[in-house]
């Protein structure tokens, strides 16, 4: 498929994209996919058949900004008016077409699973680029996991308000920040990888390139409610420099692993932040106050940078609030953080974490700090939250497994510049036998149907299976399976005699993973 111009999925409509689909973004028209408020996208790829959005150009000719990107707009809360138009250069279209925000934290914009987004971020005007993947007030019922954004010409992922929750994200060699959170975003992220390229950075006059950046809002006094307050856990954030020599050679635009400012309450847990010149910056008094009050937390986290690990707006140690010392705060014994003094990135991640190809391997040593320093999911702002998967290691990768058995296996691509897409999408894996547990959810048959149809799915190992049917409002109308089943193919009959005509979505959950498809009942 060729994506040309601004392609809007209209409110109440559903766009379905099948596993293995290849969508090429057109440069001349700035191909961009916008899922409007009230619409849904159902893009459920698999580890062996990811869905790929990429440049229309040939291998070797692709560049950041070759096309637009993906923008998903929802009805969850933000701290901006619901008439706000999303960032991205849409000044020439009707304002209502790109609005976002509402009052429903349980809003669903659909499903994004096993999706790659490559070479997006076309500039519609000076300093006005589309991000790789933009979420505008997207709600927590939206399913987001296994997403890779590569070579974005702005941010990889940007969250404007909303509370979407996502796991297994990759940001690869982007221009600006990997993650940018604004306007009251209060979602959750876990198992996140970022890797940066020393030759790709924001060289604009006002720009800088950070690991992630977070603001409550862009204008003083930064007091809008709800506050930007996401929780990030198990992040592996790898900058462009493996050691002091590489850091000293970086352009001055390379800044922080994490820039937290303008009253944000973003919190970081169980993570590894390495490879920049500088570490975490609590940029202003409002952000420092959030740290003092326990609304902004950094716990069980390791930093490895060669110059200044912790900063405020005035100096490396002393902040703008009398008596606040960011290093002392970070070193609070119960926080169990590491890295308040300078050290090399390779002290906690391997040198192969700085490879810029499919030989990239960030898996830490089995006896190293990230494996042994400790984690926690029961204290502070994580207390009582069962969404996070508790693991014993810091960062995104299990030190006991090789890269070929990590969650990135099969579907990710760390060298999209040279990938030949002439024959469509293929999985990137040295051995399919090394892939983790997979499952497949087939299209129901018949479809459309009246009143019965059959849903078929396959699981590779015995597992707990839940097969559920929802209407387009996200309301559950039937639970077809909720039991442990053996490996193999399973067929389930669905009788919709008691339902009205319309579109329904059936979801399959297997041990935490999920896929979804739509079906149409016509009476």
Task: Tell me what each language-model feature is.
Residues 2-14, 27-38, 45, 54-154, ...:
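Extracellular beta-rich repeat passengers
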Residues 4-7, 480-484:
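Beta-strand-rich interaction surfaces with strong enrichment in secreted/lumenal proteins
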Residues 429-445, 449-470, 490-496, 510:
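Glycine-centered coil/turn sites that cap beta-strands in beta-rich domains
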Residues 462, 481-517:
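Short, surface-exposed loop/turn motifs with a glycine/proline- and acidic-biased composition
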Residues 519-523:
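Short beta-strand edge segments in extracellular beta-sheet folds
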């Amino acid at each position: 498929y060729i994506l040309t111009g601004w392609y809007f999925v209209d409110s109440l409509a559903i766009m379905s994209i099948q596993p293995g689909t290849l969508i090429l973004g057109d440069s001349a028209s700035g191909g961009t996919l916008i899922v409007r408020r009230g619409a849904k996208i159902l893009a459920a790829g698999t580890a062996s058949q990811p869905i790929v959005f990429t440049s229309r150009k040939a291998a070797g000719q692709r560049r950041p900004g070759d096309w637009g990107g993906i923008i998903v707009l929802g009805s969850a809360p933000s701290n901006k008016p619901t008439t706000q138009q999303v960032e991205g250069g849409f000044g020439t279209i009707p304002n209502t077409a790109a609005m976002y925000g509402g009052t429903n934290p349980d809003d669903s914009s659909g499903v994004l699973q096993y999706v790659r987004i490559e070479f997006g971020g076309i500039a519609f005007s000076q300093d006005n680029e589309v991000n790789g993947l933009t979420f505008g007030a997207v709600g927590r019922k939206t399913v987001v996991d296994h997403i890779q954004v590569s070579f974005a010409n702005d941010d990889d992922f940007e969250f404007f308000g909303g509370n979407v929750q996502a796991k297994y994200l990759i940001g690869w060699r982007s221009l600006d920040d990997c993650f940018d959170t604004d306007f009251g975003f209060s979602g959750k992220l876990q198992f996140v990888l970022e890797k940066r390229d020393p030759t790709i950075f924001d060289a604009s006059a006002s720009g800088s390139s950070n690991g992630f950046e977070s603001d409550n809002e862009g204008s003083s006094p930064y007091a809008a409610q709800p506050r930007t307050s996401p929780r990030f856990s198990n992040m592996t954030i790898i900058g462009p420099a493996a050691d002091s020599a590489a850091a000293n050679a970086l352009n001055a635009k390379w800044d922080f692993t994490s820039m937290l400012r303008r009253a944000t309450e973003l919190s970081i847990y169980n993570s590894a932040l390495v490879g920049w010149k500088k570490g975490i910056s609590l940029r202003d008094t409002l952000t420092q106050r959030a740290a003092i009050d326990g609304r902004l937390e950094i716990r069980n986290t390791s930093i490895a940078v060669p110059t200044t690990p912790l900063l405020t707006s005035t100096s490396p140690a002393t902040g703008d609030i009398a008596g606040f010392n960011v290093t002392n705060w970070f070193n609070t014994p119960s926080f169990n953080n590491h890295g308040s003094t300078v050290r090399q990135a390779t002290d906690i991640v391997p040198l192969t974490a700085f490879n810029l190809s499919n030989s990239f391997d960030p898996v830490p040593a089995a006896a190293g700090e990230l494996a042994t320093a400790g984690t926690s999911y029961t204290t502070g702002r994580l207390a009582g939250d069962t969404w996070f998967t508790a693991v014993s290691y810091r960062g995104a990768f299990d030190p006991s497994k090789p890269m070929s058995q990590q969650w990135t296996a099969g579907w990710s691509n760390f060298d999209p510049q040279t990938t030949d897409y002439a024959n469509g999408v293929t999985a990137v894996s040295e051995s399919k036998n090394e892939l983790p547990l997979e499952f497949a959810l087939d299209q129901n048959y018949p479809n459309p149907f009246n009143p019965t149809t059959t849903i078929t799915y396959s699981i590779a190992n015995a597992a707990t299976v839940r097969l559920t049917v929802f209407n387009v409002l996200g309301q559950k109308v039937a639970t077809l399976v909720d039991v442990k089943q053996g490996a193999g193919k399973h067929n389930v009959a669905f009788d919709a005699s008691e339902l009205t005509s319309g579109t329904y979505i059936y979801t399959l959950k297997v041990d935490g993973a999920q896929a979804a498809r739509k079906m149409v009942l016509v009476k």
